Amino acid sequence: MRYLIISLFLLINSTFAFADGHLTKDQKAQTIECAGIYYANSMIPQAELELDKIVHSFAAKKFLSSYLIKEGVNEDNLNKELIKVVDVRYGKPYEEKTTNECDSFIFELIPNSKNEIEKLIKSGIY
């Protein structure tokens, strides 16, 4: 009986932990990659990319950075990883397909992320 209670407790506890939205290692890595892609996109000159895409990238990068820190990613490590992605992508043209794939991944992974990014865009604080 005791083992049954302990097993039920562990099962319920792990279900709640998963429901809180904690990311797996692979999900964190992909989210950091997408944040880096948005970061690199935000550095593309306005003459080469529409302003709305630059603003979206700024807002998405800000949202994801905050989200990842809340998920327990160390801010210094996050910044180092973002710089690695930017170093690879800086100076390259905007990739619509890659950015859309990141949008789809993030919007599916993080509940209400699309609305939160839209709020940042509308607020002008990004």
Where are these regions (language model features)?
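Sec-dependent N-terminal signal peptides
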Residues: 3-15
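Boundary at the C-terminal end of the N-terminal hydrophobic targeting segment
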Residues: 17-19
